[in-house]
């Protein structure tokens, strides 16, 4: 069932929702980011991953500086309509450190 952007609950977390980014082919979790309404609209319009930077308080496109873009193939919405999954085809590493994903440290 396709959802509309108006159905996403951006207000629960102050105008943003968490976005889990997964590789479309392997389903490996690549990163966790945040989206506001505008970045979600840009993602749907361009087919590339756009997010809201909480630390810089601005929109950013994944790969705009590094070239490691993410082609978004599907966007999933959770049952509470307050979290998203982007299924992507990455053109390079997801992490700014150069690692394939941002989850390369273990606690257990």
Swiss-Prot record:
Q: Write out the pathway annotation from the protein's UniProt entry.
A: Amino-acid biosynthesis; L-histidine biosynthesis; L-histidine from 5-phospho-alpha-D-ribose 1-diphosphate: step 3/9
Catalysed conversion reaction: 1-(5-phospho-beta-D-ribosyl)-5'-AMP + H2O = 1-(5-phospho-beta-D-ribosyl)-5-[(5-phospho-beta-D-ribosylamino)methylideneamino]imidazole-4-carboxamide
Q: Where does Zn(2+) bind?
A: 79, 95, 102
What's the protein here called? Answer: Phosphoribosyl-AMP cyclohydrolase
Q: What molecular functions are annotated in GO for this chain?
A: magnesium ion binding; phosphoribosyl-AMP cyclohydrolase activity; zinc ion binding
Report the source organism: Cenarchaeum symbiosum (strain A)
Q: Please share the entry's free-text remark on the cofactor.
A: Binds 1 Mg(2+) ion per subunit. Binds 1 zinc ion per subunit.
Name the HAMAP family for this protein. Answer: HisI
What InterPro entries does the record tag this protein with?
Answer: PRA-CH, PRib_AMP_CycHydrolase_dom, PRib_AMP_CycHydrolase_sf
Q: Where does Mg(2+) bind?
A: 78, 80, 82
Q: Which Pfam families match?
A: PRA-CH
Q: Which family does it belong to?
A: Belongs to the PRA-CH family.
Q: Where in the cell is it found?
A: Cytoplasm
* Subunit: Homodimer.
Q: Which PANTHER family match?
A: HISTIDINE BIOSYNTHESIS BIFUNCTIONAL PROTEIN, HISTIDINE BIOSYNTHESIS BIFUNCTIONAL PROTEIN HIS7
Q: Which cofactor(s) does the record list? A: Mg(2+); Zn(2+)
Q: Write down the EC number.
A: 3.5.4.19
Q: Which UniProt keywords apply?
A: Amino-acid biosynthesis, Cytoplasm, Histidine biosynthesis, Hydrolase, Magnesium, Metal-binding, Zinc
